[in-house]
Every structure is written in C-alpha cells, then in structure tokens.
Amino acid sequence: EAIYETLHWEPQVLVCAQSNTAVDWISEKLVDRGVPVLRIGNPTRVNDKMLSFTYERRFESHPAYPELWGIRKSIRETGSRMRKGSYSEREGMRSRMSRLRDRATELEIQINTDLFDSARVIASTLVSSNHRLLNGRRFPTLFIDEAAQALEAACWIAIGKADRVILAGDHHQLPPTIK
C-alpha cells in the first residue's frame, strides 16, 4: 500500500527485497493493481507469472526488437564474410559494420529508455539492484521489503541508488540467513 501511495507523487520507485520470492510477491500485487512493473534480475529465478514483466522478455517484445535482431544478424554475417574477403572488400565491410553497430546501439538505447520510462516500479533483489541496467540510475524512493531478513551489506547496494529509503518487514521474523 505504501508503494502504491508513493506513486501518486513520484514518477518511479525502486522496490527490493532479499529474496526473489518476496520481490515477485510484491510485484504481483502491484501488477494486479495496474502498476507498470519492470522486473530486473535473472529470469530463471523469477516466478512464471512475473516472467512477462522481466527486462529480458519486455526487451524482446519491444516493437524495435525485430529490427535490432536483424541488424545483429547482419553484423554476424558481415563478420563471417570479412574473414574471407580481400583487403579492399574488408575495408568496405568494416565501414558497413561500423554503421550497423551504431544503429544497433541507437536501438538498444531507445528500447532501454522506453522500458524504463514506461515502468513506475523497478523491482529487483537487493543484490540485483547492482545490475548494469541500473548503473547511473537514481530513484527518489527505495522500498526494502523483508528488511528484518535482509543482510545489511546487500541493503547498501540498493541504498546507494535512492534519495530516500523505506524499510518494511516484521522484526519478529527470522534473522538473515546465509546460504
């Protein structure tokens, strides 16, 4: 509820927890209320209901992805032909590959921007908040759920990305466990 209320005055928040299960549970509740969530982390550790909200799935379903996939395929094919061509042919192919790489980078940036701009909640585990996709991103508010079970060192990873931190959880729960 606190996350939902905070979204009335903030454009985006970061929501973290120690476990994937907790992150998925919170994310599901928000999705059920119509909040756009972008789930960051290893898709193999995300529950089935939240898979379609993972960065990887949303990236692949973006309208610009087929063009990006085609460009990447052209880059691979051009690279293969380059190894077999003469010097003058390789020079032309290098120029083509450079243009293709530039366009691929533009598309990747566009897709990333679209995905992050459309999400009101970025959800990840505390450790996954250090994912390269979140590098350089700041959030007005960070919610840490299951804070009583979170390892302090893991909390600091996410805390560095936020201006304000809200800790939530039952202090009567079990202490942090190290696996």
Q: Would you name each region that the model predicts?
A:
Residues 1-112, 121:
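ASCE P-loop NTPase motor cores of helicases and related translocases
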Residues 8-11, 19, 33, 113, ...:
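Conserved helicase motor core of SF1/SF2 NTP-dependent helicases
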Residues 120-121, 141:
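Short, Asp-centered acidic motifs that coordinate Mg2+ and/or phosphate
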